[in-house]
A protein has these predicted regions:
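Proline-centered loop/turn at the N-terminus of a beta-strand
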Residues: 106, 137, 168-169
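Conserved phosphate-binding/catalytic region of the ribokinase-like
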Residues: 98-102, 151-201
Length: 201
């Protein structure tokens, strides 16, 4: 990943270090600033986002030979469409996801759709669907499932997406309603637990 060599980027790096996260491949850019995300909570604790991201350090991430080596040495490679909204980070994401898949590293994809980061819905949908073949495990929200398949009936939408791509498992998070999972021939549904929502971020 990449953050700016600024107070925000250094604070993120320090926080990750304190939590014992390996930041050896996290780059500090002196050319681009750290992207900022502002979370807005409504009365029910649900959230929306605003981004300060024009040429953010994360969107300007380019691959280096050591990145591919780091992927090979990983047990799991996680990627998200947030890194695919702009180039060159888009090409970087696809290159590293493809490399992980080729080397047998477990790949996990969360579309994490933020439409306000994309030029338009068609571009977002196309890019997310292009990423699906690289994923062993996919995690989508109910809204993302409708966005990607056009199906408003949950189980049908999940079945359509699961059948279309070579994933091993599909997890559909449903907020307070729980989760639906498809893996092999199994379909597993679990209700959510009744809790007071504070912050869904």
């Amino acid at each position: 990943g990449q953050v700016g060599d600024d107070p925000f980027g250094r604070a993120l790096m320090d926080t990750l270090r304190q939590e014992k996260v390996d930041v050896s491949r996290l780059r500090l850019s002196d050319m681009y600033q750290t992207t900022l995300a502002f979370v807005h909570l409504d009365e029910s604790g649900d959230r929306s986002f605003s981004f300060y991201r024009r040429q953010g350090a994360d969107t300007m991430l380019r691959t280096e030979p050591a990145d591919f080596k780091a992927v090979e040495q990983s047990r799991v490679f996680f990627f998200s469409s947030v890194m695919m909204t702009e180039s060159p980070a888009r090409e970087t994401s696809f290159a590293l996801a493809a490399h992980a898949k080729e080397r047998g590293v477990v790949t996990v994809f969360d579309p994490n759709l933020r439409l306000n980061l994309w030029a338009g819905e068609a571009e977002a949908r196309d890019c997310i669907l292009r990423a699906m073949p690289f994923a062993d495990i996919v995690k989508v929200s109910e809204e993302e499932l409708v966005f990607l398949t056009g199906e408003t009936e949950l189980r049908r939408g999940a079945a359509v997406l699961y059948a279309r791509f070579p994933m091993k498992a599909l997890l559909c998070t449903l907020g307070a309603k729980g989760v639906l999972a498809l893996a092999g021939d199994e379909i597993i549904a679990r209700d959510g637990l009744p809790v007071k929502t504070v912050d869904t971020t």
